[in-house]
UniProtKB/Swiss-Prot annotation:
Part of the 30S ribosomal subunit. Forms a bridge to the 50S subunit in the 70S ribosome, contacting the 23S rRNA. Residues 8-24 have a biased composition (Polar residues). Residues 1-24 are annotated as: Disordered. This is Small ribosomal subunit protein uS15.
Amino acid sequence: MSLDTTEKQQLINSHQTHATDTGSAEVQVAMLSERISKLSSHLQQNIHDYSSRQGLLKMIGRRKRLLGYVRGKSEQRYSDLISKLGIRG
C-alpha cells in the first residue's frame, strides 16, 4: 500500500517546515500515517494477510518512535502534528 507521487507531494507540502523540507520528522510521520491507514483498510478486506500485518506493526512502531522524537524536541510541534493528522497521542 504505497503512496503515489502526487499523494507524497501533497503530504510534503502540507507538513513541511520550510520550502525545501522533504524529510523532517513531521513529514515522515504524515507519510507513515497515510500508509498505515491504507494498509489498515487492506487488512480489513484481507484478514489472513499476515506478512502485511507484520509490516503494519513495524510502521506503527516507527511512527511511535518519530512521534517521541518530535515530542522531545517541542511539545507544541507534537500537539500540532497529532491534531493535524487526527491521531491520538
